[in-house]
Amino acid sequence: MSIMKKPDLSDPKLRAKLAQNMGHNYYGEPAWPNDILFTFPICIAGTIGLITGLAILDPAMIGEPGNPFATPLEILPEWYLYPVFQILRVLPNKLLGIACQGAIPLGLMMVPFIESVNKFQNPFRRPVAMAVFLFGTAVTLWLGAGACFPIDESLTLGLF
């Protein structure tokens, strides 16, 4: 018994659908059991084998090895905390820095209420939400890049 389902080309309904470029789902190789039982496990095993082989043959170091007896000149957090670190570093009062970080989620929660008149889902037709998103992205990138510079050059990114 063949797994392939042969189309009946003498059927007028099928001929009409084929004339309209339809009917490709009526014949061909089925996904079950051919793809799911044979092709997918081979792809998954190959991917796992490739990643494991690369990890064993060429172990890449993540940064330089740590030395517990030497303190670095400047301690930086992980890259995703650079903007928060920069806010705390630049603002003179630490309470003001914490208040600014608390104001960010509060401001984001206010955006739907500010733009509640606009019923469009398309982001290009929602100017307030798009402006808040673009401004927040630009400020986050600016703060993140500034965290890598010394404190006196961090706000200007060393350009001025």
UniProtKB/Swiss-Prot annotation:
It is a multi-pass membrane protein. One of its GO terms (biological process) is photosynthetic electron transport chain. It comes from the Bacteria. InterPro entries: Cyt_b/b6_C, Cyt_b/b6_C_sf, Cyt_b6/f_cplx_suIV, Cytochrome_b_C_euk/bac. It is found in: Cellular thylakoid membrane. The chain crosses the membrane at residues 36-56, 95-115, 131-151. GO terms for cellular component: plasma membrane-derived thylakoid membrane. Pfam families: Cytochrom_B_C (PF00032). PROSITE patterns: CYTB_CTER. CDD domains: cytochrome_b_C. One of its GO terms (molecular function) is oxidoreductase activity. Its main location: membrane. Keywords: Electron transport, Membrane, Photosynthesis, Thylakoid, Transmembrane, Transmembrane helix, Transport. PANTHER family: CYTOCHROME B (PTHR19271:SF40). Belongs to the cytochrome b family. PetD subfamily. The 4 large subunits of the cytochrome b6-f complex are cytochrome b6, subunit IV (17 kDa polypeptide, PetD), cytochrome f and the Rieske protein, while the 4 small subunits are PetG, PetL, PetM and PetN. The complex functions as a dimer. Component of the cytochrome b6-f complex, which mediates electron transfer between photosystem II (PSII) and photosystem I (PSI), cyclic electron flow around PSI, and state transitions. This is Cytochrome b6-f complex subunit 4. It comes from Picosynechococcus sp. (strain ATCC 27264 / PCC 7002 / PR-6).
